[in-house]
Every structure is written in structure tokens, then in C-alpha cells.
A protein has these predicted regions:
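Bacterial Sec-dependent N-terminal signal peptides
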Residues: 1-26
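Flexible, glycine-rich surface segments
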Residues: 158-240
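Extracytoplasmic/secreted cell-surface and envelope-processing proteins
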Residues: 48-54, 77-79, 96-98, 192-196, ...
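Structural alpha-beta junctions
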Residues: 59-70, 199-211, 252-254
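Amphipathic beta-strand/beta-sheet edge segments enriched in Tyr/Trp
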Residues: 90-147, 216-282
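A compositionally biased, intrinsically disordered/low-complexity signal enriched
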Residues: 38-41, 108, 183-184, 200, ...
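A surface/extracellular/periplasmic glyco- and lipid-processing/surface-interacting theme
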Residues: 124-179
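Start-of-domain marker
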Residues: 21-105
Length: 282
């Protein structure tokens, strides 16, 4: 089983470096979550782009539990209460990986009277960036990520297939449904081999558009159900190069259509690759 190292989203106040087995949620955990109030943990930087975007997302779209916004200090004071849940950015490491990079995950945790954050039950979490990547490269997607997590948790309530360590593999069965949508990608999220429009069109049989991040943010705001977009998590030019996560997320229906990752090495570049496009054709 893989092991994780978690630290809190804010390095200014405190940091927790602990190793723990990955928690697999139970049906009882999911049922308990729906009886909690969810506390959304904001970062300490008052100018944080993430803070602004996640507040907008939660206030507009979060409906499954009552919610309140708190800071990191309050999180430390409240996290042992089992009647509370938390939406929080944590940093994750995979000690068994050859290159031990740190990744930001947007996670939903249950309160528990435990010493370590790693022992708090995690309902689910989605990778959003490498730890040292500027939040402007991903914060614009926050509304889609928050609504996807909400939809995923609702699905967990009735679908036991999602109660697994590899819960997002479940969504790859939706891969064929992407053919009826427009796939929007930002150029920097494509591997170098796939950055020409001719290459994209020759390797992907359906509609694909290279757009700006502002276009994706606008589509998310408008809940454009004709659009799916690439959410890529990679080093973005930073020194640490390890995993590259690739997700195709639907807008409006808040569904995941594709989930995969590869280790960056040799021809395995930072971004969506030609082999991913070919998988999406099927």
C-alpha cells in the first residue's frame, strides 16, 4: 500500500511532516460526513488567489453540508471534533516514488480526536498542483474542482465502488462520453510533442480546442455543459519532476471523464501526451 506524507496548506503558521497509510473511507465515514458542518480552511495570505476563488466556489455551489470559512489556526483548534468536516489544501508526498515531490491536494477530511493530521479520515482528495507551483496556474479551476468533489461525495453515498484507495479509476468508464463534448486545453498543459494544432487534430478524432485559462474559467462560471477541460498537475518548469496527473473534467455535470498519471522521464513529458489522446479516442 502506498504511504503519504501530509503537511498543512499554510507553511507560515505550522507544518506537519508525518507518514501514514492512505486512509480508505468507509460507508460509515461517508454517512457521518453528511451530518457534519464543513469548515473551509483558507490560507494565511489575505491576498491569496485560492482564498478568493474557493470562497466564491463554496458560496455559489456547495450545498451538501452547512459550511463556514476558517483560518489555519482555527483548523488546528477544531480538527479533533468528530462533528466537523474540513475542506482544506494539504501537501502530499509519496515516499515510495523514486523522486519524492510534494503535491497540493484539495481534500475533504473528517474531524477526529487524533494527534496527527494523517490519522484524520479522508473522504476524498484531488491533486491540484505541485507544492511550489504558483497558485495562479490552477486557482481559476477552483469552482470546477470544488463542485466535482461535492458530486463525487454524493456519489459515494450510494456507490460502494468508490470506497477504495484508487477511487478515481472508476471514472475512466466515462471516457467514451467525452466524444460528444468539446475538449478544451491550455497550451502549457500539453506535452511538447502535442503542442501543434496539426498534431492534436491528427491524433484526436473529436473536437479539441486550445484556449486561454480565462476561457475555461468563463465556461466554468457559465456552467457550459458542452465543454470538458484538461486539468493537468505537473512541475510547470520547477526543478522537481516526478508525477504528471491528467484529468478531463466536465463542466455543469461535474463529472470526471479521464484520470491517469505518468512519471516524467525521457519522452514522458510534463503534460497531456499523444498516447492520452489515443486513449480518449476509444
Amino acid at each position: 500500500m502506498r504511504k503519504f506524507i501530509f503537511i498543512t496548506a499554510s507553511l507560515i503558521l505550522s507544518a506537519f511532516y508525518c507518514s501514514a497509510e492512505r486512509y480508505v473511507p468507509t460507508q460509515a465515514d461517508v454517512d457521518r460526513f453528511f451530518k457534519t458542518k464543513t469548515y473551509v480552511v483558507l490560507q494565511n495570505n489575505p491576498m491569496s488567489e485560492y482564498n478568493m476563488k474557493v470562497k466564491e466556489a463554496v458560496e455559489k455551489f456547495w450545498t451538501i453540508t452547512p459550511f463556514e470559512f476558517i483560518n489555519n489556526t482555527q483548523f488546528e483548534e477544531m480538527r479533533k471534533d468528530p462533528e466537523k468536516s474540513f475542506l482544506v489544501v494539504i501537501q502530499v508526498k509519496f515516499p515510495k516514488d523514486k523522486i519524492e515531490a510534494s503535491y497540493n491536494f484539495l481534500s475533504v477530511l473528517l474531524g477526529a480526536a487524533v494527534k496527527r493530521i494523517t490519522d484524520m479520515p479522508e473522504i476524498c482528495g484531488i491533486p491540484i498542483s505541485y507544492a511550489n507551483v504558483d497558485e495562479f496556474s490552477w486557482a481559476y479551476k477552483s469552482k470546477a474542482l470544488v463542485t466535482f468533489l461535492q458530486n463525487h461525495i454524493q456519489l459515494m453515498k450510494t456507490n460502494s465502488e468508490l470506497l477504495t484507495a484508487n477511487m478515481f479509476n472508476y471514472y475512466n468508464k466515462n471516457r467514451g462520453d467525452v466524444h460528444t463534448k468539446e475538449l478544451w486545453v491550455v497550451e502549457k498543459d500539453l506535452a511538447k510533442e502535442a503542442r501543434s494544432l496539426a498534431t492534436l487534430q491528427s491524433n484526436y478524432k473529436f473536437t479539441i480546442k486550445v484556449v486561454k485559462s480565462e476561457d475555461i474559467e468563463k465556461a466554468i462560471e457559465e456552467r457550459n455543459t458542452n465543454v470538458v477541460f484538461l486539468h493537468k498537475v505537473g512541475p510547470e518548469g520547477t526543478r522537481m519532476q516526478a508525477r504528471c496527473y491528467k484529468m478531463i473534467i466536465g463542466i455543469g455535470e461535474n463529472k470526471l471523464y479521464y484520470w491517469d498519471y505518468h512519471t516524467i522521464k525521457n519522452k514522458e513529458d510534463d503534460g497531456l501526451m499523444i498516447k492520452d489522446l489515443k486513449k480518449l479516442n476509444k
